[in-house]
Amino acid sequence: MSTDPPQNTPQRQSYSTGTPWEKAVCYSRAVRVGSQVFVSGTTASDEQGQTVAAGDAYQQAVYALKKIEFALSQVGARLCDVVRTRLFVTDISRWDEVGRAHAEFFEGINPAATMVEVSRLVNPDHLVEIEVDAVVGNW
C-alpha cells in the first residue's frame, strides 16, 4: 500500500467534507479524474455525523441529494452532468418517497438509475444512501 495520498492535480481533484465517516474510513466525498466524477455513498448525516430527518426517507433523500449537489460543485460538476445514480434503501416499500426526491433533482436529466433494498446501512437511522457518477464536458 502506498502511504502517500494522491494529490489534487489538473487530472485528479478530491473533495472531502471532513465528516467523521470520511476520516474513519479514509475516503473522499467526491473524486474527479479528467472528465469523470464519482460521488461516494451519501446519507443524511450532518457535519458532526448526526442523522438528519430520522424516520423520514423522503427528507433523508433530499438532504443527501443536496450534499451530492454541493460535492459535485466542489469538483467543477453539476447535477446536469450526472449520468448514473445508485440508491440504496433499507425498506423498498418506501421507494416512492425516495423516488420522489430523486425526481425533484433529476427531472429532465434522467440519469441511468438503480434502486435496491439493503438489509441495513452503517448507521441504523439511515434509510437511504445515494451514489452518483457524472461526466463533465463536451462528449
Model-derived features with residue positions:
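N-terminal presequence-like segments and the immediate start of the first folded domain
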Residues: 1-66, 70-83, 89-139
